[in-house]
Amino acid sequence: MSRDTIVAQATPIGRGGVGILRVSGPLAQQVAEQVLGKTLTPRMANYLPFKDSDGTVLDQGIALYFKAPNSFTGEDVLELQGHGGQIVMDLLLKRILQIDGIRLARPGEFSEQAFLNDKLDLAQAEAIADLIEASSEQAARSALKSLQGEFSNKINELVDSVIYLRTYVEAAIDFPDEEIDFLADGKIETHLREIIAKLAKVKNEAKQGAILREGMKVVIAGRPNAGKSSLLNTLAGREAAIVTDIAGTTRDVLREHIHIDGMPLHIIDTAGLRDATDEVEKIGIRRAWDEIEQADRILLILDSTENQVELDLVQSEFMAKLPPHIPLTIVRNKADLSGEAEVLDEQNGLAVISLSAKTQKGVDLLRQHLKQSMGYQVCTEGGFLARRRHLEALEQADIHLQAGLIQLTEFYAGELVAEELRIAQHHLSEITGQFTSDDLLGNIFSSFCIGK
């Protein structure tokens, strides 16, 4: 493990009331002696001048020193809390970097040090970035629960259960004359089914956490003048898009970030789909299809005042081009003009909603539908946040536990059961970082802020 001493600004770049520089590593006390002219007592606040190499005072503020291992990173840590002007922060940072053995921290390197020194596991370290980036109160509460170890504790309980079961199975393998009796006595199967049930519950909670963290990408598509931009404005609660009676008004992609009962949604309005001759409009339509192909759900907007035969043709042509794995919802807009009732129905396996973006009648049905389609459940207490890699690891663990159950109940193959349990344990342990590649660590921590 690197024993470098690193420094970075811990507060956001720019002007502020307070600016903080963080130093972590074996030379932290030496930095204090050279910049402050004083050896600091651990965990005691000192109000001191911060000096340049020639003794000129650069700033004055509070200095805090934490002796390893009793710090965030597990290393010696010095924090200098001064005035938040960026020039002042830059001068102080430049001064510290003049000291031999000090270098600028990489993005996320403080959190990486904390992980490598067993102050945080990997899921907790990721929760720091998630807490900073939280886009809603519920997401922030859930990220804090992950940081406090709620997600990690659930994973560790699963890992401990798998290890216990592996020990039992491998003990049976060591006594081949009695192996079948051990495997067939029902205890292993009972324990394995209990683990699978617990994992299913954690998977469901993790899915909710992933929705809270990443949101749902919803693309509004359809022919010109169907009311796509009006629906975007209604969902956004503001005039985000220009709305006119002129077909093709929207020529580029418009994005809005909204929340429905705490669930983040990325709503994307696109250019009307038609055979365009205008070059600018053609570019907009190509961009529309690019967004459609990356969506979590498509809202195909139809003008319910038009002839039904024409609408059926529009829908069939769109579905013929739509990638089959992308969920589709049909929205029959302008119900206030066509006289249709504002309802949510199902036709040929597709959700069909009649509404009026102009009067907003039926729009709440759409909001509820979007929540239900993602399996989102409102939780007033908040759960924990999860990432896509967590969901993938949980899914792989489930696959191998299920495979182990088959090897147990159908073939009584003790060695194969043990191997499936080992692989499941490995995938679960990847979440907290017990088994993690250096490449994965690099990808995770490089996405952090410099000072975290």
From Swiss-Prot:
GO-annotated molecular function: GTP binding; GTPase activity; metal ion binding
Binding site for GTP: 225-230, 244-250, 269-272, 333-336
Superkingdom in the source lineage: Bacteria
Localization per record: Cytoplasm
PROSITE patterns named among the record's database cross-references: G_TRME (PS51709)
Binding-site residues for (6S)-5-formyl-5,6,7,8-tetrahydrofolate, renumbered to this chain: R22, E79, K119, K452
Residues that coordinate or bind K(+): N225, T244, I246, T249
A GO term from the CC aspect: cytosol
HAMAP family: GTPase_MnmE (MF_00379)
Functional summary from the UniProt entry: Exhibits a very high intrinsic GTPase hydrolysis rate. Involved in the addition of a carboxymethylaminomethyl (cmnm) group at the wobble position (U34) of certain tRNAs, forming tRNA-cmnm(5)s(2)U34.
Protein name as catalogued: tRNA modification GTPase MnmE
Organism the protein comes from: Histophilus somni (strain 129Pt) (Haemophilus somnus)
Originating gene: mnmE
